[in-house]
């Protein structure tokens, strides 16, 4: 009986240590999940505004071709680029930690500056005497690639969140199993103690 008590105490201590480790791991996993969810929410705004850049630029080009100048729309696009590249401006945009996206955004931003020069040329000489249509098509493809890069980054975060959630579930399952094992061991020990008491009473 004494050996069983020692074995029970030893196993209880081991289970307690494992439980503490699993709880600590669970806390860390939950923190990582929260951080990645926050990143995912910020990424959604970036994707939205990157898509708006694509659409708004096409609209600006069409307006210029039809001789409807819109400097406010150009300023609006400039502000979005400031937000996307430097997290400046009024749009509360986050910086995506993805090199491919930033490389494509840099190329797109540089090409936007060239496109603005071409818009100025359209106003001075008419769109027939410029390369505005071809440039806008190239720009659209660049913008599409930039949005795709942001979407790929977003998907990677989503996959990471799903993986962390799965690990959290497994962690909690292990905790439940340990609690069940601990409960069964305690019940077994309780039964043994009662049997010992009964024997002691009978012997007396």
What is each residue range found by the language model?
Residues 1-9:
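Short, Lys/Arg-rich, polar N-terminal cytosolic tail immediately upstream
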Residues 9-36, 169, 173-176:
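Extreme N-terminal signal-anchor transmembrane helix of membrane signaling/transducer proteins, especially
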Residues 9-15, 150-169:
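Membrane-interface helix-start motif
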Residues 35, 39-50, 69-70:
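Membrane-proximal amphipathic alpha-helices
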Residues 47, 52, 56-65, 103-162:
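Extracytoplasmic
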Residues 63-121:
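Extracytoplasmic ligand-binding sensor domains of the Cache superfamily
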Residues 159-192:
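Alpha-helical transmembrane signal-anchor helices
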Residues 191-204:
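Amphipathic HAMP/coiled-coil signal-transducing linker helices
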């Amino acid at each position: 009986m004494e050996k069983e008590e020692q074995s029970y105490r030893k196993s209880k201590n081991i289970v307690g240590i494992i439980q503490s480790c699993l709880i600590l791991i669970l806390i860390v996993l939950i923190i990582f999940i929260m951080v990645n969810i926050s990143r995912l929410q910020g990424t959604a705004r970036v994707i939205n505004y990157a898509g708006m850049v694509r659409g708004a630029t096409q609209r600006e080009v069409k307006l210029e071709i039809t001789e409807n100048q819109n400097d406010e729309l150009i300023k609006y696009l400039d502000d979005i680029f400031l937000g996307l590249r430097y997290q400046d401006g009024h749009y509360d945009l986050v910086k995506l930690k993805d090199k491919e996206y930033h490389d494509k955004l840099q190329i797109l931003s540089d090409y936007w500056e060239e496109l603005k020069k071409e818009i100025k040329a359209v106003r001075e000489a008419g769109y027939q005497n410029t390369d505005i249509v071809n440039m806008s098509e190239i720009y659209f493809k660049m913008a599409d690639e930039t949005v795709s890069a942001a979407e790929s980054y977003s998907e990677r975060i989503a996959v990471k969140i799903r993986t962390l959630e799965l690990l959290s579930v497994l962690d909690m399952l292990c905790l439940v199993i340990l609690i069940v094992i601990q409960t069964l061991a305690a019940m077994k020990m309780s039964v043994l103690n009662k049997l010992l008491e009964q024997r002691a009473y009978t012997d007396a």
